[in-house]
Amino acid sequence: VCELREGGHHSGNWGGALADPAAILAHAIATIISQRGQIQIKEWLPPPMSNAVREALKGVELDGGPTGPRVDRDWGEPGLTPAENVYTWNSFAVLAMLSGTPASPVNAIAPWARAHCQLRYIAGTDVDDIVPALRRHLDEHGFAQVEVQPPPAGNAAGFSASRTELDDPWARWICRSVERSTGVPPAILPQMGGSICNDLFTDLLGIPAIWLPHSYTACSQHAPDEHILMPLCREALALMAGLYWDLGDRQVEHP
């Protein structure tokens, strides 16, 4: 938030003499993320990707189908594929931004500007230093007037990032079960970009957590026309039926 004064002031009388909070906030955000989506705060970067993870993602493509968005291959961390950027790297996004009244603008210097931003992070990121690092970064770049506030109550929920390692015995066992059910080796994602409370299992209970897909990424989740595809539902039923069968089959070796 950049709030400089109370009320707007006529741009013809005060333009050039009053600082523009929207311009200040836009420049502040531009120091956080580059024009190509690369995070500029070093404390926000995750640990380097392991060779095992890179190998697992080899050949994995982001494809939302005919209704999904086109992938911007020049966005994100340079040198990473789109899949690696989503599943092995942190990402920063401006969820909403406002100054003045966009639907009915007036000739006035706005008193404030506000942006709701988000950092999606993977396991290994120093969560406790995310906000302090942002504050230090803004101060070092001359943006002391930009205030960092907590998210609104309706969007304040958060989960700690977690990961079940690729060489976990249960991860390998489930891969074999899925391949038995489908006849096709599964694509393995080391972690997801979404907000999932897996840390309750991996960190609190100390057990592996593994997810099997029941939908696809272009399902308009949390948006109008959220939907599922029946072929994927049928495949998901087969995956889960095969998995539970193998769990109860004494002829199948278990970890």
Sequence positions of predicted segments:
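Metal-dependent amide/peptide-bond hydrolase catalytic core
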Residues: 1-231, 235, 248-255
